[in-house]
């Protein structure tokens, strides 16, 4: 349809629409001329140059738009919960994945499971809160993927629940280094590899706590708010390199990380009461959102934070019972 319309315009140009020559591969170009009306001054004309869509961008098939075949991915913290679901989602869509975890035994078990499932997944031991280990991880990834990386999923995160005034310096440092400093540094390290891929995608795992107030989570929510703003800033800064930056912000998801707090039935009922869908989320419901943001089908989406929260973050006062 786009090609037909362009052909029609080229052969039957309406008034104020002109084609101009160009040495660019994106040609012909459209030159839209229009007049600014100013009652106090003589009218003047301006031009807007609109690059004509390339044949290759139109020719991509539907199957390719929803596939990660030929792409490489790094997922941090990929042996449990949301991280494991992300690894399996990306690998299932055809990506070659490298993941990391602190627990070597746990990592080896996961790698065995993935190998039996036919997934192309490798892994290495890494504590991403440690700067030198992050550097070693990215050296490994660069070697495995020959200097290119299409997808970076910064999944690792932790939480300490307590009133802000009770935080020790060590606890504050732990949350900041694990939740924010690690993702910031990994992005710095991954940038040359993402740029080399010509179509990079970074996805941060944020949280609804970056949008709304949650009890005893002032420090954790600060790290997630920082991630949300980093998402927006990097999306603009790295757009010139065709690297997209997005984030996914979950609410309570059924993982081992929240088992203890949700073992309190009264607390669980309160969680349900502020969640319009009235249930907890599943790791797969987060991983599918992450995968979408990595697919060619989402190639015009950047700088966005996608809430996977059953409607919690937009719920004002909408009681489940009248």
Curated annotation (Swiss-Prot):
This is Tropinone reductase homolog At2g29260, chloroplastic. It comes from Arabidopsis thaliana (Mouse-ear cress). Belongs to the short-chain dehydrogenases/reductases (SDR) family. SDR65C subfamily. NADP(+) binds at residues 74-98. It is found in: Plastid, Chloroplast. GO terms for cellular component: chloroplast. Its EC number is 1.1.1.-. Substrate binds at residue 207. Transmembrane segments: none annotated. It is an enzyme of class 1 (oxidoreductase). InterPro entries: NAD(P)-bd_dom_sf, SDR_fam, TR. Residues 1-61 form a transit peptide. The keyword Oxidoreductase applies. Keywords: Chloroplast, NADP, Oxidoreductase, Plastid, Transit peptide. PANTHER family: ENOYL-(ACYL CARRIER) REDUCTASE, TROPINONE REDUCTASE. GO terms for molecular function: oxidoreductase activity.
């Amino acid at each position: 349809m786009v090609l037909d319309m362009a052909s029609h315009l080229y052969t039957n140009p309406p008034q104020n629409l002109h084609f101009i020559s160009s040495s660019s591969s994106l040609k012909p170009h459209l030159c839209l001329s229009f007049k600014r009306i100013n009652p106090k001054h003589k009218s003047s004309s301006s031009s807007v140059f609109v690059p004509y869509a390339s044949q290759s961008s139109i020719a991509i098939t539907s199957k390719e738009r929803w596939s990660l075949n030929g792409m490489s991915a790094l997922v941090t913290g990929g042996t449990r919960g949301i991280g494991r679901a992300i690894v399996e989602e990306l690998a299932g869509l055809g990506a070659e994945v490298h993941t990391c975890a602190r627990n070597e035994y746990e990592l080896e078990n996961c790698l065995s499971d993935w190998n039996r499932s036919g997934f192309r997944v490798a892994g290495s031991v890494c504590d991403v809160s440690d700067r030198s280990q992050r550097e070693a991880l990215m050296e490994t990834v660069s070697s495995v993927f020959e200097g290119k990386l299409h997808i970076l999923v910064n999944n690792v995160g932790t939480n300490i629940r307590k009133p802000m005034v009770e935080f020790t310096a060590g606890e504050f440092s732990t949350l900041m280094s694990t939740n924010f400093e690690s993702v910031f540094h990994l992005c710095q390290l991954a940038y040359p590899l993402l740029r080399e891929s010509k179509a990079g995608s970074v996805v941060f795992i944020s949280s609804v706590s970056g949008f709304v107030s949650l009890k005893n989570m002032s420090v954790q929510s600060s790290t997630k708010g920082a991630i949300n703003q980093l998402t927006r800033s990097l999306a603009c800064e790295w757009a010139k390199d065709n690297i997209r930056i997005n984030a996914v912000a979950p609410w309570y998801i059924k993982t081992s990380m929240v088992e203890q707090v949700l073992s309190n039935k009264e607390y669980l009922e309160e969680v349900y009461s502020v969640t319009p869908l009235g249930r907890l989320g599943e790791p797969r419901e987060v991983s599918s959102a992450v995968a979408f943001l990595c697919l060619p089908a989402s190639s015009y989406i950047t700088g966005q934070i996608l809430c996977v929260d059953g409607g919690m973050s937009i719920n004002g006062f909408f009681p489940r019972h009248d």
